Amino acid sequence: MRHFLSELCILFLCMGIAAGCGSGNGRNDTALPTACSGFNGTKVDTQAVCNLDVLCRVWGYAKYHHPAFYGTKGQLDVDAELLRLLPTICNADKTERNRLLAEWIHSLGEFTEAPERYESYCGEGFRHEAATTWTADTAKLGSELSDLLCRLRFADRRGFNRYVKPRQPGSSSPDFSRENGYPNLTSPDTGYRLLALFRYWNVIEYFYPNRHLTDKQWDEVLPEYIRRFTECGPEGYHAQLAMLITELHDSHAMLYPAFLPAEAFIQVNAQFIGDRLMVVPSQPADIHTPIPDDIPAWPPLRFGDEILSVNGKSIDSIRSDIRKYVSCSNETAVGFRTTVYAFTSTDADEYVVEYRRGNATDTVRIATRTDRNAREFIDFPKYAVSEEGCMLINDRIGYIDAAQFSNEQGRRIMNVLKNTEAIIIDLRRYPSDFMIFAFLGKYFAPYAINHVIFTHPVYSLPGCFREDRPAIGHDNPDYYRGAVIALVDGNTISQAEYTAITVQALPRGLTVGSTTLGADGNIAEIPLPGGYKTLISSLGVYYP
């Protein structure tokens, strides 16, 4: 009886949402129920996929273009609007679909056009990443809906959109924190899964500076994942989210909680040498001294051992999982993520690691740890240098470890290194301070140098990005005249990559090493239904 009453309550709740399809400016959707969406289809035919594709585009376009979602006026909840539309749009024919969507846009309220406000965004220094030409397709959308969408492009919008704005005044990074992540939604039904897909797809469409760099055309991703998100069921939702995010091939684009999680780990320092996962030294080394072959890693593993499998799973198989479920910009990132996951992929008390030493193969059991805050999962090579993070390798060559560097020590560092012929800046670990302007610009630039091009969103015209060409340095006759060498590898990411780009812009700057992880630029966080969060690179970064 208790079970029956629970089911009855849920049924009435779902019916209430489905029935609440009224329109008009007066509706208030701030108290959206979250038990179920009112749409729980599990199969979609070709027409339904087409309908949902159009719905996603029109809903997202209106969300970011209609004045009803700007400023502090009105209380429309854009998620509730979508959930109301889903059941009727999914099963409509094309004519009915277009009529209903046009009626919905009318219901959001009247708007005026102000094309003159956007004229400057069509000139030099702006890039238009979103493909908005689909709004003019009258054969697909019908004349009324198409006309409304085309007019919305240059609607008179005031203030910021309620679902995206700059992170802080003067910031270029978007803030999506007003999006509802529905953290108490433990088993998202079809409607909420499609809400996640539609929200994410439109964020990328209008606010992702690297949209044009995805391996698969972003337009092609939508219909494919409409089927996936509809048919996967609540139990497959997490995996589909992970695979969707992987379509970006952006090493910043992590999903939390990860689809490949674990609570326990072993601390083995390893990295790919070619296609082989090799154990490498894990403790600080003197840069002058060759590394002996018998340095222990985590006993009984030693420097030079090749890891063949972990818990019965080959390294190639783990790498395949990473490609499928973890967003990686390049093969270097695939190798890095594989290395991390190989040793954080179980909740068991121990790992079984198969390894090769010389011509012999053996297996070892290593106890796991759960004190994740004790230290990093994987140690990166580092050298014992001074407290200032610098040292003289010899009279001609200086060395700076970016991971131990501080701008406060800049003057003292240059006093030590100023008479050298070259300075190596080691960027193989994440910089501990932002050295671009206060250090590199101050001591290494003879004049103002445009070292990078950034692109960041124009919030009043979604899909448009403004170019920014910042400069480092000023007229400085006493600048350092030696060579400046950025040392990079597969651990170099984000701010470290930006630092390397800046070094290359210096008069005698160059980069030495191997391919970096490929995730430059600031990040933005996107909440998704079910309490999930994901990141994107939110700033386009280009060589000048």
For each predicted feature, which ranges?
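C-terminal motif of bacterial Sec signal peptides marking the signal peptidase cleavage site
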Residues: 17-20
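Cleft-lining beta-strand/loop regions that shape enzyme active-site pockets
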Residues: 33, 44-51, 62-77, 87-89, ...
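Extracytoplasmic/secreted proteins, especially bacterial periplasmic and envelope-associated proteins
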Residues: 50-60, 77-84, 96-103, 107, ...
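Conserved PDZ fold ligand-binding element
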Residues: 58, 62-66, 84-88, 200, ...
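Extended, small/polar residue-biased N-terminal targeting/export presequences
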Residues: 69-178, 196, 209-275, 347-352, ...
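PDZ/PDZ-like domain segments forming the peptide/carboxylate-binding groove
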Residues: 47-48, 56, 60, 131-167, ...
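Bacterial N-terminal signal peptides that target proteins for export
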Residues: 1-9
